[in-house]
């Protein structure tokens, strides 16, 4: 009987070792499936991140292009305004010079008028009176001087 009990024990051991191997094999397959699923989820996350970053890059490139265009337009406007401003400065200088010249003429006429009034008494108002023979005193000649056009060109601009 001894032999029969040892035979059942060995078959039980073989069966239990077979079931352990089967159980280990199942666990191994389960781990493999779990690892595959985890790797698939990881790849999906990476792909989503890559897609998001690509979309962000495209958006930033578009925004950068818009900013560069805006800066270019603003620079052109600035240069145009700067050129116009330079012309206006030149015209201002010319007008100031002409005003100073006219003030000098008026001052000269006033002093000349005072001398003439003291000496001859002929001209009472140098800007209105036609009785004076002086070229600068004659109103027709004064209108000629005052109606000269202003000349300013962008070529002669000084900053």
UniProtKB/Swiss-Prot annotation:
Residues 53-67 are annotated as: Leucine-zipper. The keyword Nucleus applies. Residues 27-48 are annotated as: Basic motif. Keywords: DNA-binding, Nucleus, Stress response, Transcription, Transcription regulation. Induction: By light. Induced by hypoosmolarity. Repressed by sucrose (at protein level). It comes from the Eukaryota. Transmembrane segments: none annotated. Residues 25-88 form the bZIP domain. Forms heterodimers with BZIP1, BZIP9, BZIP10, BZIP25 and BZIP63. Interacts with ADA2B. A highly conserved upstream open reading frame (uORF) coding for 42 amino acids is essential for the BZIP11 sucrose-induced repression of translation (SIRT). Plants over-expressing BZIP11 show severe alterations of plant growth and development, reduced seed set and viability. This is bZIP transcription factor 11. It comes from Arabidopsis thaliana.
């Amino acid at each position: 009987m001894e032999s029969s009990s040892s035979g059942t024990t060995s078959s039980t051991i073989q069966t239990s070792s077979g079931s352990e191997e089967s159980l280990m094999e199942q666990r191994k397959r389960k781990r493999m499936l779990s690892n595959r699923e985890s790797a698939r989820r990881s790849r999906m996350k990476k792909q989503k991140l890559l897609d998001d970053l690509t979309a962000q890059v495209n958006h930033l490139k578009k925004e950068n292009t818009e900013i560069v265009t805006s800066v270019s337009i603003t620079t052109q406007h600035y240069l145009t305004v700067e050129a116009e401003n330079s012309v206006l400065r030149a015209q201002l200088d010319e007008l100031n010079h002409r005003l100073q010249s006219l003030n000098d003429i008026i001052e000269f006429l006033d002093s000349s008028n005072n001398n003439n009034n003291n000496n001859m008494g002929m001209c009472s108002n140098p800007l209105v009176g036609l009785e004076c023979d002086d070229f600068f005193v004659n109103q027709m000649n004064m209108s000629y001087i005052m109606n000269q056009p202003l000349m300013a060109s962008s070529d002669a601009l000084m900053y």
